[in-house]
Design a protein with these regions (language model features):
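Acidic anion/phosphate-binding donor-loop and adjacent secondary structure
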Residues: 139-140, 148, 152-169
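Short hydrophobic beta-strand element within catalytic cores of glycosyltransferases
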Residues: 253, 272, 276-279, 289
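Acidic donor-binding loop of glycosyltransferase active sites
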Residues: 247-261, 275
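Glycosyltransferase donor-sugar binding loop
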Residues: 46, 205-218
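Nucleotide-activated donor-binding/catalytic signature segment of Leloir-type glycosyltransferases, i.e.
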Residues: 218-237
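Conserved acidic donor-binding segment of nucleotide-sugar-dependent glycosyltransferases
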Residues: 291-292, 296-303, 312-318
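Conserved donor-binding/catalytic core segment of Leloir-type glycosyltransferases
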Residues: 4-9, 164-183, 188-194, 206-207
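A short, well-ordered alpha-helix in the C-terminal region of glycosyltransferases
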Residues: 305, 312, 319-333
Length: 348
């Protein structure tokens, strides 16, 4: 690749403690590009709170086109509406190589409703999506410049020889995500409580990690007050410390029905720590969690099934422990090395 600048357009939220999936994914890609191309200059267009910083961001975007040959774009729904016309418009004059690394799983549905978005997507050199099903859906709209690039993280994947069977009570279930209602916080708390009432004593406990959405904070506090006997909020942990925090848990719970869900990084964290996952079959979770191999998926419209899975796993811990090795092996698919090889082939 010629020695020329590389730009990344996306939410890095510099100077904040944001740990949502979009921000983490953008930061990770930037870090890995810097590792692969240390001799290149980088221009970062941080789209965090872009509506409050419109002029500086516009100037930064123009600078990216002036100085960089390769421009990576990572934007969610609202960001796409604002930036795509700007980026594709500027590129009519600059003719840069634009790469769209898709955030979340909502893009096919958005594109189906928007001919303008379809045209914009066709103007990128490539659109990287997280699942084969997303590629297929976009292909049906005539968008063929699409490749599958799974989400990835640089984590210290637990070695198989360090795996330990979990057999202590109460069995510790964990959630590790942004704390919003749609991630299934209430369903998880109710299910843990219902399982304990089924047993007649406390055999399951839920720990929740992650930043609390300000709009959900009061409701979440009421949830903790109601279920404080079996649900504990543990605060935030750095993204690169996730394996260390999760490895002492029994299983990860992921009862999400979040509209923009793509490939959840929290499931990669869990697999890296040797944790099987109980997840809804919402969006693409079924492509990630293999029933009976790396966890269990259940119908997201039947939350009572989560309670049943908790009861079953607590009474059959040997089945859960037998999945841990498969989780570690699966985590190996989501390392930066494999993903960056695919990305670098495009740049070179």
């Amino acid at each position: 690749m010629k020695k020329k600048g590389i730009a990344v357009v996306g939410r890095m939220a510099e100077g904040t403690q944001l740990l949502d999936g979009q921000t983490v994914k953008t930061r990770i890609l930037l870090e890995e590009l810097c590792r692969c191309y240390p001799e290149h200059d980088f221009v970062c267009v941080d789209t965090y709170q872009y509506r409050k910083r419109t002029i500086p961001i516009l100037l930064r975007t123009v600078r990216a086109f002036l100085q960089c040959e390769h421009i990576f774009v990572l934007l969610s729904r609202n960001g796409r509406k604002f930036f795509f016309p700007l980026l594709t418009g500027l590129n009519k004059f600059f003719h840069r190589r634009l790469y769209h690394d898709v955030i979340g799983g909502a893009l096919p549905d958005e594109a189906a409703k928007s001919p303008a978005l379809q045209k914009q997507l066709k103007r990128f050199e490539i659109n990287w999506v997280e699942f084969a099903q997303m590629k297929e859906s976009l292909g049906q709209l005539g968008i063929t410049n699409v490749e599958v690039l799974p989400n990835f993280k640089r984590l210290n994947i637990l070695r198989e020889e360090n795996l330990k069977d979990y057999d202590q009570e109460p069995f510790l279930f964990t959630m590790f995500s942004r704390v919003v209602k749609e991630k299934g916080m209430e369903e998880a708390a109710r299910s843990i409580d219902a399982a304990n009432r089924h047993f007649g004593n406390k055999r399951a406990e839920l720990h929740i990690y992650g930043p609390i959405d300000p709009q959900y904070e009061e409701e979440f506090q009421r949830l903790l007050e109601t279920y404080g006997h079996c649900v504990i909020y543990k605060g935030c942990i750095p993204q690169n410390k996730s394996v260390e925090a999760l490895r002492s848990s029994f299983m990860l719970l992921f009862p999400s029905y979040y509209a923009g869900e793509g490939m959840p990084g929290t499931i990669i964290d869990a697999f890296s720590a040797g944790l099987p996952v109980i997840a809804t079959d919402w969006h693409f979770n079924g492509e990630l969690v293999q029933n009976g191999i790396t966890g269990y998926c259940y119908d997201w419209q039947k939350p009572e099934l989560l309670t049943q899975h908790i009861i079953y796993t607590v009474t059959h811990p040997s089945e859960v422990n037998a999945m841990r090795s498969a989780c570690i092996k699966t985590a190996g698919r989501y390392t930066p090395e494999a993903a960056m090889k695919q990305i670098c082939q495009r740049l070179n």
